[in-house]
Amino acid sequence: MCSSDLQSRVDWREALREFVSTTCSGNDYSTWRRPNRRYISAGVYLPSGITETVGELIIAIDTSGSIGGRELSQFLGEVCAIAKAVKPQAVRLLYWDTKVCRDEYYMQDQLDDIVKSTKPAGGGGTMVECVPEYMREKQMRPQAVIILTDGYLGGSWGTWDVPTLWCILDNKHTTASVGKTLHIDSSDM
């Protein structure tokens, strides 16, 4: 039996990077339709490699009042760094409480501006099922969803059709019933 002082701590930034890089990696494959030009002059015909780009990444942020500005800013800074490394075609921020209050869309060349230009909205209760409902209503098909919340939900965890990572802030006793859960201690931010 381990006391809470002896339990290993996972760096949430590394865990977040790991989720994004494994879930959202572009598809690499090779094709014989276009031979690799580097070897043709030597008379060797090899397939050329093709990498598909990463599509859209959705970041859904709980704005029910329990997520402070400091945590939000640091989390978005880390997400921005991850997005630069993975290079998704777009990042969509969804601010939610009992409904999606704001939907912001950033193309790949705008990722540096996320922290400076975002305008969080909300402040009501906490009903996360509004996020997958909104995504279905708007026919969004992201490669993955990252949710930042304190885990104190007023309803269910929702039904998700895409890989989902729950970043639960300062609530070690709550684990999402769908997707992967990452617990974050605000003192680590």
Give the residues covered by each predicted segment:
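VWA/integrin I-like adhesion module and closely mimicked acidic/polar interface patches used
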Residues: 152-189
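N-terminal basic, Ser/Thr-rich segments that initiate or prime the first beta/alpha elements at protein or domain
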Residues: 16
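Acidic, Ser/Thr-rich peripheral helices and adjacent loops at domain boundaries
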Residues: 103-128, 182-189
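Extended, H/D-rich, highly charged conserved domains that either
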Residues: 8-13
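Short, small-residue-biased leader/transition segments that mark boundaries at the very start
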Residues: 1-3
